[in-house]
């Protein structure tokens, strides 16, 4: 498509793997000692890098009740000691912009400019990517951001998430989980700030969300707190004492340059916040804070017709869209239960009973 990045295949990815001053004092006080310092090599799977090096490889998940999996991974190590930052994308293999953004970071991060270590996973759900299946891993039908911390003896999804938990989450200091609109989701960019109730930890992750620069931030105060049933990647990191952020950009199977740039530049800004790169971060100054989100689902099967676009502000009771039967008769109307902003809306006509029509957010009256 004109104006878009060309989308690399999984084989291409495998080959190519081969704000400001106020935040610095805050992070220095709270982050504690980095997970990695000194001249030793750092390895994740077959990717092993020493100071000033970049390495690519795979994190192999052995076969069990179903097929094994090789997860593409890269390690980029700076020339100076510092924290470990993990960047994970592709839990949903058709969220293409986020996959391409992390792959671009693998190519462009310069170890000579860096302090610390970056672990990069551009594509967790390779089967979803290759088969163009949204939302789930087609090998076992499971959502790869709903089964953390995984199981060593589970299905492919569970075994993969167990490996990510052990080999990446437990070895990093900071983590960013990359997502976006799936094939059927027309999404506006936004991020999730995990509000855990730990004031010191929440202050750091709030600064990370601001530094990333997306202008809409969802306050996620309801993430699981049990490390043994953490469900999401960001919650898995948080329940293990890490500083985690989730970001969303990209929509409906596209790889728009502005979405890729937002994810790449946001990552570089966070790295500056963490003193992993020189320079100052570029935080968003006046974000829209979302205090709660709601998923609106269809009560009927048929043809979906949206009436609002991503990012639209709608009043309580306003019609967001409707579903017709295959003869054109309206069988369901979707309305906003509160005044809200549309975070994403279904991008395709296909609709089954129980499918998501839209996810909307209620804007906070004042910043947290």
Give the role of each language-model region.
Residues 2-18, 36-368:
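Structured catalytic-domain cores with a bias toward divalent-metal coordination
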Residues 20-31:
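Bacterial N-terminal signal peptides
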């Amino acid at each position: 498509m004109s104006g878009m990045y060309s989308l690399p295949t999984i084989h291409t990815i495998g080959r190519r793997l081969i704000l400001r001053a106020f935040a610095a004092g805050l992070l220095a006080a709270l982050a504690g000692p980095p997970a990695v310092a000194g001249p030793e090599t750092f390895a994740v799977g077959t990717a092993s890098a020493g100071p000033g090096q970049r390495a690519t490889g795979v994190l192999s998940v052995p076969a069990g009740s179903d097929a094994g999996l090789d997860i593409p991974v890269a390690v980029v190590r700076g020339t100076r000691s510092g924290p470990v930052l993990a960047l994970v994308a592709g839990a949903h293999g058709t969220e293409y912009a986020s996959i391409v953004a992390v792959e671009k970071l693998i190519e462009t991060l310069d170890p000579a400019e860096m302090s610390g270590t970056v672990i990069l996973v551009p594509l967790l759900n390779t089967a979803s990517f290759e088969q163009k299946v949204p939302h789930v891993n087609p090998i076992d039908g499971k959502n790869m951001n709903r089964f953390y911390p995984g199981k060593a003896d589970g299905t492919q999804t569970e075994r993969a998430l167990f490996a990510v938990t052990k080999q990446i989450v437990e070895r990093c200091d900071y983590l960013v989980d990359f997502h976006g609109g799936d094939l059927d989701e027309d999404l506006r960019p936004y991020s999730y700030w995990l509000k855990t109730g730990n004031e010191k930890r929440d202050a750091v992750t709030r600064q990370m969300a601001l530094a990333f620069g997306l202008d809409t931030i969802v306050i996620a105060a309801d993430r699981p707190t049990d490390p043994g049933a953490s469900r999401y990647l960001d919650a898995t990191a948080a329940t293990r004492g890490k500083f985690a952020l989730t970001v969303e950009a990209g929509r409906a199977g596209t790889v728009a340059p502005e979405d890729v740039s937002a994810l790449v530049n946001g990552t570089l800004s966070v790295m500056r916040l963490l003193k992993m790169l020189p320079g100052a971060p570029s935080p968003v100054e006046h974000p829209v804070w979302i205090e709660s989100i709601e998923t609106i689902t269809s009560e009927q099967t048929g043809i979906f017709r949206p009436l609002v676009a991503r990012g639209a502000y709608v009043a309580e009771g306003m019609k967001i869209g409707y579903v017709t039967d295959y003869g054109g008769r309206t069988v369901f109307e979707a309305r906003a239960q509160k005044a809200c902003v549309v975070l994403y809306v279904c991008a395709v006509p296909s609709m089954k009973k129980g499918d998501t029509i839209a996810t909307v957010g209620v804007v906070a009256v004042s910043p947290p």
